Amino acid sequence: WERMCLVSLRALAPSLTRITVAAAVGAALHIGQGNPDLVDAKAVEFSRAVLTQTDVEGEVISCEGPKDNAPAFMRREKVGTGKGPKVEFVLDPVDGTTAASKGRKDAISALACAPAGCFQVLPDDGYYFKVATDYHSVNSISFDMSIEEIVRTVADEKRLHLENFTVIMLERDRHAEILQRLRKLGVRIILIPDGDIAAAVAT
């Protein structure tokens, strides 16, 4: 059964790509116009139109937007034609909405898709601690570790001294303590205003 699911999802790859492309096209219509909600609204509209034609029995279990009162998919929204594999989606039609509205780089359309029941649904009324790295250290770190332990472990796996190791993080007031701890650790730090998914891809 697991192999069948993998084959089915692999076959969906072109359709999933069309969904994110549609979101990006919708957002691109309003790049630099200073209206983040319009960027979001068009990205949602365009991606929903493609999802409606996608041969899946799908459900949106989580999406970016509601906590910011921005245009978004509805949680538990049913999507797809109702034919094909049962899947669930986590959707962010535009990560970096503000960046797109100001004509800046690193806005990106993203989604995750898995067989129904695979994703853990978390409350979407707050922020979560996230770490992105490459395959070298993915099995060596956990959220039970301190930020210092995580950074040291990833740097060791990459065979880098801390002074040559770079951490990218969003510049937010809520990250002030983590930023202070990282500076004490001696790593290089790049603070970005938006677009942490694009930063994660860069790792």
Language model region names:
Residues W1-V90:
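N-terminal subdomain of lithium-sensitive/metallo-dependent phosphomonoesterases centered on the IMPase/IPPase/PAP
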Residues L122, A200-A202:
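Short, charged, surface-exposed secondary-structure boundary motifs
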Residues T52-Q53, K78-G84, D92, S101-R104, ...:
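Solvent-exposed alpha-helices and their adjacent loops that cap or buttress functional pockets
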Residues G84-D95, A99-Q120:
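DPxDG-like acidic metal-binding loop motif
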Residues K67-N69, R174, P193-A200:
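Short acidic loop-to-helix transition motifs that present clustered carboxylates
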Residues A112-I192:
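Acidic beta-strand-loop-alpha-helix segment within the catalytic core
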Residues L9-A13, T98, Y135-N139:
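A short glycine/serine-rich beta->alpha loop
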